[in-house]
A protein has these predicted regions:
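Short acidic, gly/pro-rich beta-turn/loop elements at beta-sheet edges
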Residues: 27, 144-146, 157-159, 198, ...
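Catalytic core of non-heme Fe(II) oxygenases with the double-stranded beta-helix
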Residues: 112-185
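Non-heme Fe(II)/2-oxoglutarate
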Residues: 1-95
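Residues at beta-strand starts and edge strands
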Residues: 11-13, 105, 130-132, 204-206
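Short, solvent-exposed loop/turn segments at secondary-structure junctions
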Residues: 22, 141, 154, 192-194, ...
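A structural signal for short, well-ordered beta-strand segments
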Residues: 109-111, 134-136, 208-212
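Active-site region of the double-stranded beta-helix
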Residues: 75-107, 115-131, 138-145
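Catalytic core of Fe(II)/2-oxoglutarate
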Residues: 167-219
């Protein structure tokens, strides 16, 4: 049919940028390392208790180290957190949201490192009560875990058909795997389901994860 028009409705976006400059900032990296080291130290009792229960030395296999969730308060990350905050607000405005009576604030930001002995991963999830979420990759390679985004329309899962070519992004695709490198930034709406594939523990895998919420200025 020659006059058939395609009208895109309810689009889903992931926003990507390459920002290696932060990895060249000694203060930024020192902050990342300090928070990571503390998270690893804090997990030692958990690892010991797990090994005692299982009666087997398995180290940190399958674990994921999380720092405290107020990383955005570290002054060494001030430029980074402001960039994320402003960019997130711009994204919501460009999507058509009226934010005159709202300000965007972090609910959490933490640095996360997958187990050195492999098995680190994250199951599919969303970040409820938030509006923009994202990742900034500090350490990764083509051998490490990858972020995977899933179609948020759960209803279509019942009637999905085979996909012609999984290597091509198309409306039929039910999930998309992203290839990232150190310095990659990904931003997306917090309702978008996402996960991280199982990491084999070959190379270090570490990233900053954050969530922001639009809060009313007045009630």
């Amino acid at each position: 049919m020659s006059d058939l028009k395609t009208i895109s409705l309810f689009d889903t976006f992931v926003y990507q940028a390459e920002l290696p400059k932060y990895l060249e900032d000694k203060n930024f990296i020192n902050a990342c390392n300090e928070h990571t080291d503390k998270a690893i130290a804090d997990a030692e009792p958990t690892i010991a208790a797990r090994e005692k229960k299982l009666e087997k030395s398995i180290g940190d296999h399958g674990m994921s180290y999380h720092s405290q969730a107020e990383l955005y308060k570290d002054e060494r990350l001030a430029d980074f957190e402001l960039l994320i905050r402003n960019t997130s607000r711009n994204i919501l405005q460009e999507q058509g949201f009226e934010l005159t009576n709202y300000f965007l604030d972090y609910t959490e930001m933490w640095i996360q490192k997958f187990a050195t002995q492999g098995g680190g991963h994250q199951d599919t999830h969303v970040h409820w009560d938030n509006h923009i979420s994202g990742f900034y990759f500090v350490e990764c390679s083509d051998k490490t875990s990858k972020p995977i985004f899933h179609d948020p329309r759960q209803g279509r899962m019942m009637l999905n058909l085979p996909i012609k070519d999984h290597s091509k992004l198309c409306p039929a695709m039910e999930r998309q795997i992203f290839t990232v490198k150190p310095g990659t930034l990904l931003l997306f709406n917090s309702w978008l389901p996402h996960q991280f594939s199982v990491d084999n523990g070959i190379d270090p895998f570490r990233f900053i994860h954050f969530n922001l919420q639009a809060k009313k200025l007045t009630i």
